[in-house]
Amino acid sequence: MVIVPRVAIGVDMHAFESGRPCWVAGLHWPGQDGLAGHSDADVAAHAACNALLSAAELGDLGANFGVGQPEWSGASGVALLSESARRVRTAGYTIGNVSVQVIGNRPKIGPRRAEAQQVLSAAVGAPVSVSAATTDGLGFPGRDEGLTGIAVALVYAAPAA
């Protein structure tokens, strides 16, 4: 039997919103402005959700957990990621891995990278790597207006039992 992998890219971005708690890569960042959104606006977790759902042909974050579904209002990115992974598995796929990059000036991901990877990997039930980059002052994240998350996910059809 030939295993055919499926790969997809997911993107998410949110503007900073003063007064909201900051959740990025499954972690709370005290003292940082949070991000505006229907849920906790965790760009890393949301990008990973988009990548996983797309790889399994299950749509995207908005189609699965959007504003038309009030039960997901205020949900944590980790909860959305865990539910996305469950849906991917229910659709007959095994998750190989996910890689997420957070683009922006703050918070500084590096010092908490291992913690973020542990939290997101537990939510997915597969390895999740986390990295970060700045844009040297260019664009939305470079102007410190918010953050962008980009993720890639690898899934493959689960072997028949």
UniProtKB/Swiss-Prot annotation:
Its EC number is 4.6.1.12. One of its GO terms (molecular function) is 2-C-methyl-D-erythritol 2,4-cyclodiphosphate synthase activity. Gene3D superfamilies: 2-C-methyl-D-erythritol 2,4-cyclodiphosphate synthase (3.30.1330.50). CDD domains: MECDP_synthase. It is an enzyme of class 4 (lyase). It catalyses: 4-CDP-2-C-methyl-D-erythritol 2-phosphate = 2-C-methyl-D-erythritol 2,4-cyclic diphosphate + CMP. Homotrimer. This is 2-C-methyl-D-erythritol 2,4-cyclodiphosphate synthase. It comes from Salinispora tropica (strain ATCC BAA-916 / DSM 44818 / JCM 13857 / NBRC 105044 / CNB-440). The gene is ispF.
